[in-house]
Swiss-Prot record:
It comes from Trichlorobacter lovleyi (strain ATCC BAA-1151 / DSM 17278 / SZ) (Geobacter lovleyi). It is found in: Cell inner membrane. This is ATP synthase subunit a. The keyword Ion transport applies. The chain crosses the membrane at residues 26-46, 83-103, 112-132, 143-163, 182-202, 203-223. Key component of the proton channel; it plays a direct role in the translocation of protons across the membrane. Pfam families: ATP-synt_A.
Amino acid sequence: MVHPLLFLQFLSTKLQHLLHISDASANAVVYTWTVIVLLLVLSLIATRALKTIPSGVQNFMEVVVDGIENMIVETMGEHGRSFFPLIATLAIFILVSNLVGLIPGFYPPTANVNTTAACAIVVFLATHVVGIKHHGFHYLKHFMGPIWWLAPLMFFIEVIGHLSRPVSLTLRLFGNMNGHELVLMIFFALAPFLVPLPMMLMGVLVSFIQAFVFMLLAMIYIQGSLEEAH
C-alpha cells in the first residue's frame, strides 16, 4: 500500500533505471504485471478441472462471469455478448487492480494515470472501430447532427465530446484511486493500527464502484456507436 514488498520494489527499481522512468511509473508497470499474472493463475486454477456442478474457484469465477454477462445483456441487448471478452477483461482487471492496493505492501496500478489512460484509450478505439465496422462511412453521421446546415458546428462539438470521453474515464478512475491511496497514507502515518480500517473498508466499496462505473460507461459508449444516426 505504502511500502512495497522488497522483491517487487527490487523489480521496480531495476525497471526504473533500465527505462529511465519515474518511481511511480515503474511501480505501476510491475504491479500491473503482478495483477495480470495473478489473473492468469486464477484462470488456470478455475479451468484446470472443469466440472458439470462447479465448486470452489470454478464456482466463484462462474458467478463473476455470469454476473458481468447478464449486466452486458441487460444494458446492450443480446448483441452485447460479442463484446463480453473486452468489457469483462477490463472490468475484472480494473477491479483486481483496485483491490490490490488494499494489501499492505502493494501498489494499485489504477492509482497511476498511465494505467487508467491505457484502459480508457482501449475503450475509445474499440468504440469507433465497432462503429465504423457496423455502419461503414455512414458512421460519420453520428457527428453531423440532425440538421444539415448545423453539421459543421455539430461535427466540431461532437469531436470534442468524443475526445473528452477517454479523458474523463482516465481522470475519474485515477483521481479516485490515487486519492484513496493518499488518504490511507495519511491515516497510516498518524495512527498505523485500527484507525485506517474504516478507510480500508471504504476502499473495497470504492474499488467495486469505480470498476462498475468504468464498465458501464464502456458499454454505453459502444452501444451508442451501434445505434443509427438521426
